[in-house]
Swiss-Prot record:
PANTHER family: E3 UBIQUITIN-PROTEIN LIGASE TRIM. It catalyses: S-ubiquitinyl-[E2 ubiquitin-conjugating enzyme]-L-cysteine + [acceptor protein]-L-lysine = [E2 ubiquitin-conjugating enzyme]-L-cysteine + N(6)-ubiquitinyl-[acceptor protein]-L-lysine. InterPro entries: B30.2/SPRY, B30.2/SPRY_sf, Butyrophylin_SPRY, ConA-like_dom_sf, PRY/SPRY_TRIM22, SPRY_dom, TRIM/RBCC, Znf-RING_euk. It comes from Homo sapiens. This is E3 ubiquitin-protein ligase TRIM22.
């Protein structure tokens, strides 16, 4: 279309009031046409100022509001002009209202949108605060710039944290690898005995490694995701700041809300206290226990049970290694069971030197074992036995079991109550409660006659020391002592190195 012709046509369809292309044109009797919104606004002003009289804004010819008529012909021309006007320059669409075809030159604060003056008069924006674009551009630009700088700074911090976590993750891997090597080296020194213990520690280490490294990996993923979100916002803000005022202000409230609400969430750091989980266990202590057990096992003697010391209440096996109760005894407060009912001595007796033996007590719920050395002739009728009945007077039951009377023993009652019996100032022994990390199925007994020591070892728990009597005074030979009590499960003396 020839430019001059285009200009003439566009002039004919331009509203004399807003100087924009006609929108919903209305024509007066004088022949002039206006946008419906424009002439309606003028009529309202005339009603207030001129007491209801209206005149054409161009030629001042008076008219009645009811004589306004829609001009569809002009409306069609306007649409054709818009098509011709907009198609060559697609970029102009950004500056024109898509609803009314008017220039976008007003900013609605409530909606955060750039609108035309027709939109401003519409019901949608009624009562909203509106400003000319040039009135708010600088303030909005400053806010966007502040938001951009804050996000860039946060992103830089996130990048640094990501690098720190990456380095920390590597350090943790190296540290764990070193600890793994220590554990492997330590357990290799006692592979035969502690293979199960080694596997347990390695499993704990690997679980801790997975936990720590997974947490650090999750922290890295979280930071990567946050950086992606920040990058999207940064790109949006940079695009707006590079673009036109309309591009910058369009939907700016949403962008501002997202940028202001975005805050770097720092991942939780791995507690340094967790390093204790990865430390090699106290292998030296465990090795010391094993060494002590190995040392005393050097003195292992083949103890046999003495049938001559047994009563009809117990039975000793043919190989003289096992004793069990064959007749249970009912305990009464007034008449506690005779001590001799269950007690059995070893055939061997020791008056010097060092000796060691082991006893299998698997499955038993009661027993007493240790060392006995005769002190003086005691009336067996006054001795006492072991009781399960809660009504039994324990002071009578345990009165014999004390070093003063020649007994250095430990015992089990009621399935899980382990005790040692020491001297006391009263007539009753001092009953000590023993803690067992692992219930013993096999117990080692060590006697050092000259040193006056009787020690008990939990062979089931790598030879952990159960209890140790020191300062024992042996005036006569010492005998191994066994008492299965009225528990029908047998107790067995183990052959050396079995």
């Amino acid at each position: 279309m020839d430019f001059s012709v285009k200009v003439d046509i566009e002039k004919e369809v331009t509203c004399p009031i807003c100087l924009e292309l006609l929108t919903e044109p209305l024509s007066l009797d004088c022949g002039h046409s206006f946008c419906q919104a424009c002439i309606t606004a003028k009529i309202k002003e005339s009603v207030i100022i001129s007491r209801g009289e209206s005149s054409c804004p161009v030629c001042q010819t008076r008219f009645q509001p009811g004589n306004l008529r829609p001009n569809r012909h002009l409306a069609n021309i306007v649409e054709r002009v818009k098509e011709v006007k907009m198609s060559p320059q697609e970029g102009q669409k950004r500056d024109v209202c898509e609803h009314h075809g008017k220039k976008l030159q007003i900013f609605c604060k409530e909606d955060g949108k750039v609108i035309c003056w027709v939109c401003e008069l519409s019901q949608e924006h009624q009562g909203h605060q509106t400003f000319r674009i040039n009135e708010v551009v600088k303030e909005c630009q400053e806010k966007l710039q502040v938001a951009l700088q804050r996000l860039i700074k946060e992103d830089q911090e996130a990048e640094k944290l990501e690098d720190d976590i990456r380095q920390e993750r590597t350090a943790w891997k190296n540290y764990i690898q070193i600890e793994r090597q220590k554990i492997l080296k330590g357990f290799n020194e006692m592979r035969v005995i502690l293979d199960n213990e080694e596997q347990r520690e390695l499993q704990k280490l690997e679980e801790g490694e997975v936990n720590v490294l997974d947490n650090l990996a999750a922290a890295t993923d979280q930071l990567v995701q946050q950086r992606q979100d920040a990058s999207t916002l940064i790109s949006d803000l940079q695009r707006r700041l590079r673009g036109s005022s309309v591009e910058m202000l369009q939907d700016v409230i949403d962008v501002m809300k997202r940028s202001e609400s975005w805050t770097l969430k720092k991942p939780k750091s791995v507690s340094k206290k967790l390093k204790s989980v990865f430390r090699v266990p106290d292998l030296s202590g465990m090795l010391q226990v094993l060494k002590e057990l190995t040392d005393v096992q050097y003195y292992w003697v083949d103890v046999m049970l003495n049938p001559g010391s047994a009563t009809s209440n117990v039975a000793i096996s043919v190989d003289q290694r096992q004793v069990k109760t064959v007749r249970t005894c009912t305990f009464k407060n007034s008449n506690p069971c005779d001590f001799s009912a269950f007690g059995v001595f070893g055939c061997q007796y020791f008056s010097s030197g060092k000796y060691y033996w082991e006893v299998d007590v698997s499955g038993k719920i009661a027993w007493i074992l240790g060392v006995h050395s005769k002190i003086s002739s005691l009336n067996k009728r006054k001795s006492s036995g072991f009781a399960f009945d809660p009504s039994v007077n324990y002071s009578k039951v345990y009165s014999r079991y004390r070093p003063q009377y020649g007994y250095w023993v430990i015992g089990l009652q009621n399935t899980c109550e382990y005790n040692a019996f020491e001297d006391s100032s009263s007539s009753d022994p001092k009953v000590l409660t023993l803690f067992m990390a692992v219930p013993p199925c096999r117990i080692g007994v060590f006697l050092d006659y000259e040193a006056g020591i009787v020690s008990f070892f939990n062979v089931t728990n790598h030879g952990a020391l159960i209890y140790k009597f020191s300062g024992c005074r042996f005036s006569r030979p010492a005998y191994p002592y066994f008492n299965p009590w009225n528990c029908l499960v047998p107790m067995t003396v183990c052959p050396p190195s079995s």
